[in-house]
Amino acid sequence: MPPIYMNIILAFTLSLMGMLVYRSHLMSSLLCLEGMMLSLFILGTTMALNMHFTLMTMLPIVLLVFAACEAAVGLSLLVMVSNTYGLDYVQNLNLLQC
């Protein structure tokens, strides 16, 4: 396995570990989730370029679109929670149910 793939997988693993450690704060969870999506984007792009697989070149762009939608929803949820409660704890999300 080339070292670039090892570095990307290590970045994904570190983001996953950060997501598990900082799961009580919404902002930290969103940042770790964005790190995971970015490492998956880079991994998909490098694999598509190295394998010369033309059908796979659209996959990283679709992943980037979903990551942007996830970031927009996450940031709007963060703003709503912080305006309502003043804190960004994930446990406050249960209180927002109708």
From Swiss-Prot:
The keyword Transport applies. It catalyses: a ubiquinone + NADH + 5 H(+)(in) = a ubiquinol + NAD(+) + 4 H(+)(out). The keyword Secreted does not apply. Its EC number is 7.1.1.2. It comes from the Eukaryota. GO terms for cellular component: mitochondrial inner membrane; respiratory chain complex I. This is NADH-ubiquinone oxidoreductase chain 4L. GO terms for molecular function: NADH dehydrogenase (ubiquinone) activity. It comes from Orycteropus afer. PANTHER family: NADH-UBIQUINONE OXIDOREDUCTASE CHAIN 4L, NADH-UBIQUINONE OXIDOREDUCTASE SUBUNIT ND4L. Keywords: Electron transport, Membrane, Mitochondrion, Mitochondrion inner membrane, NAD, Respiratory chain, Translocase, Transmembrane, Transmembrane helix, Transport, Ubiquinone. Belongs to the complex I subunit 4L family. It is found in: Mitochondrion inner membrane. Core subunit of respiratory chain NADH dehydrogenase (Complex I) which is composed of 45 different subunits.
